[in-house]
Amino acid sequence: MLVASIVGVDMRATMDIDTTVKALPLNEKDARAIIERIGELQLEDGVKFKITSVKEIMEEFDYPGIRMMIEANLERMRQPFKIDISTDDAITPGAVEYKYKLMFEDRSISVLSYNLETLLAEKMQTILARGLANTRMRDFYDVYEIMNSKADQISFDVLKKAFAATCMKRETSFGEEEVGETLDKIKDDSGLEEMWNRFKRANYFVDDLSWGEVSETIVDNIEKISFLATRFPGSVMKRE
């Protein structure tokens, strides 16, 4: 939802909300209590929320946490969606205030959110860590769109630090040669290109964006981060 708002895709096909909590215990009982309290707020919009399931997110995901399936009801309409709640994410240098425009009301609300650099860093780490096994075309689209539409708002020094902090949080490190090989494989892989074409057909907002354009933008910018990271102490980039 945050990325959709940032790049101006108002009706993006997503049913996911990702959030992180600070200074609170993260377990099923407390997470349920928090979401129930939020859902009980009276806004006179007629929408009612019901938690349908709660479970722990296991280690195979990018981050451990709690996943909640929720059903929103408005008269006869029902809309399921999920909320993933994590804790102590490495937001570098820190959360920022973001004005989120509401869908059904002509106003915005203030929320604390990731800064652009941390948002990009998490997706870049996922792209490198998963390599050819990454089936989440949304990650590639998000990086491309943010790098192109918000380039003047991105600090590469902050992005480098955010990338390093994300890798440390997720306990990953990458050698220079490994980065180059992974990016070359991503760029040239016919399987990823086919998945991209399916993603493009299923999502109108992608328009006629080719895999070549997307992968080139991603490769160029991750290589730039790699170049910077090897020149700062405490880096997660390893020299071969």
Predicted regions and their residues:
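Glycine-rich beta-strand-to-loop/alpha-helix junction loops that act as flexible
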Residues: 1
